[in-house]
């Protein structure tokens, strides 16, 4: 366990950040969470956050002792400066530059900047996010180089010694499910399966084998593929 100060987890209510929350609870003495309301089309993920926080502490008494307050920040300004399929009712497609139109420019940069400011006030040294390069859509602000550079910038600009952790950076979705199993067994896997939301279209009515979602958007396809590979690996 890491003992120097605590951690602030960027917790959206999705699979990746939920796994990162468990990862942080397993390592730090104090863990707080922060979520961002930026007018996302799949805002149902925000509605999953409180219930997930309440249920994850039931899995481990030590985690219950470590989980601290939750913070939710209004970032509706993101919807004013960008027009994407995550903030507009638009069909998901590739842009002319090859990026999907679900990319919200600057989103993670803004998330981490505000999280670092909040963490400084809360005296939390460690920032934890669920970004990864392995199963991703080419988002520039999910890259390892971007986040390492951002850590330097945040420390220079805020005068802190924050550490940015991205425990999923080199994991694919199957390995992310596997990490959840290592951290909390099948109970945590099932909690993430049923208690988080990933679908870009905000479909939280249909419970699939791998969780809620439409099953056809890029986020659902990645989650479904990872789930199938994870379960297949258990049968080998």
UniProtKB/Swiss-Prot annotation:
* GO BP terms, alphabetized: queuosine biosynthetic process
Could you say which residues bind ATP here? 11-21
The cofactor note reads:
Binds 1 zinc ion per subunit.
Q: Which cofactor does it need?
A: Zn(2+)
Q: Which cysteines are joined by disulfide bonds?
A: none
Keyword annotations of the record: ATP-binding, Ligase, Metal-binding, Nucleotide-binding, Queuosine biosynthesis, Zinc
The pathway where this protein functions is:
Purine metabolism; 7-cyano-7-deazaguanine biosynthesis
Q: What is its EC number?
A: 6.3.4.20
Q: Which Pfam families match?
A: QueC
Q: Which family does it belong to?
A: Belongs to the QueC family.
Task: Name the job this protein performs.
Answer: Catalyzes the ATP-dependent conversion of 7-carboxy-7-deazaguanine (CDG) to 7-cyano-7-deazaguanine (preQ(0)).
Please report the name of this protein according to its UniProt entry. 7-cyano-7-deazaguanine synthase 2
- In the UniProt record, the gene name given for this protein reads queC2
